[in-house]
Amino acid sequence: MATEYASSGEYIKHHLQNLTYGQHADGTWGFAHGAEEAKAMGFWAINVDSMLFSIGLGVLFLFLFRLAAKKATVGVPTGLQNFVEWVIEFIDTSVRGSFSHQNALVAPLALTVFMWVFLMNLMDLLPVDWLPYVATMAGIPYLKVVPSTDPNVTFGLSLSIFFLVLYYSVKMKGAGGFFSELAFQPFPKFLFPVNLLLEGVGLIAKPISLALRLFGNMYAGEMIFILIALMFGGGWVLALFGGALQWAWAVFHILIITLQAFIFMTLTIVYLDMAHAEHH
């Protein structure tokens, strides 16, 4: 597929472009025909591919775990049940080790975050040309299949966690306690403007770093796969080397995929634990 483009730059730009729907400059609504047109659509434009893949993978997660729960047996687990039980035990251990309070929401939330992010990251292991080529044959000009390479998705996830942190911070400590936590430490109370600035920046940095860490790592991984795919258009020697390189990077990328999902989940638990901690 790389040979169908006029240049390597055009190939890369195509694979990094989302299928974006929004309002055109003339007031009509439709899909963007390039990066500039997508940018001109503004804030309310929707990356349709990111939405469809992220929602679809979320539904897949619910379906698989629901199926495993319905078919669970008291004997030795096998197949899907074995995998689901292992994941749940892993999440339970992680929550017990990082969350020191009582909240029935945290463990299911941690499970959902881990599996959802993992499945979105896992899409990066699909060959970069497969689904975009099928989409092109169906008349769809652009298709990005890895939702976690879209900052809109990663920021949506991190902001959801951030709002939960704010909610539990106020619920557990009260509005006054939460404010005093921001304004009266680490320096003496008369320096509350400095404290408020420092703690406020630290608070806002949490969702930003959470989103950018996931986005940056997955975007870089996708870019490497795209660059390797370019080698298949450079003759059989480069194609052979590219195939070996792609396999090696895919094996290594499995670690990155899992690690990024684990980090996102762990930081979610830690932030919620901090929100539940009593103010002193």
UniProtKB/Swiss-Prot annotation:
Q: Known Pfam families for this protein?
A: ATP-synt_A
Gene Ontology process terms (BP): proton motive force-driven plasma membrane ATP synthesis
Provide the Gene Ontology terms for cellular component. Answer: plasma membrane; proton-transporting ATP synthase complex
Q: Which parts pass through the membrane?
A: 45-65, 105-125, 126-146, 159-179, 190-210, 223-243, 250-270
| Topology within the bilayer | Multi-pass membrane protein
Subcellular localization, as worded in the UniProt entry: Cell inner membrane
Instruction: Could you list this entry's UniProt keywords, alphabetically sorted.
Output: ATP synthesis, Cell inner membrane, Cell membrane, CF(0), Hydrogen ion transport, Ion transport, Membrane, Transmembrane, Transmembrane helix, Transport
Output the superkingdom of the source species. Answer: Bacteria
Q: Name one GO molecular function term.
A: proton-transporting ATP synthase activity, rotational mechanism
Could you give the subunit structure recorded for this chain? Answer: F-type ATPases have 2 components, CF(1) - the catalytic core - and CF(0) - the membrane proton channel. CF(1) has five subunits: alpha(3), beta(3), gamma(1), delta(1), epsilon(1). CF(0) has three main subunits: a(1), b(2) and c(9-12). The alpha and beta chains form an alternating ring which encloses part of the gamma chain. CF(1) is attached to CF(0) by a central stalk formed by the gamma and epsilon chains, while a peripheral stalk is formed by the delta and b chains.
Family assignment? Belongs to the ATPase A chain family.
Which PANTHER family does the protein's record reference? ATP SYNTHASE SUBUNIT A, CHLOROPLASTIC
NCBIfam families reported for this sequence: ATP_synt_6_or_A, PRK05815.1-1
| HAMAP family, A to Z | ATP_synth_a_bact
As for what it does, the entry says:
Key component of the proton channel; it plays a direct role in the translocation of protons across the membrane.
Q: Write the protein's name.
A: ATP synthase subunit a
Question: Which organism does this record belong to?
Answer: Thiobacillus denitrificans (strain ATCC 25259 / T1)
Quote the gene name from the UniProt entry: atpB
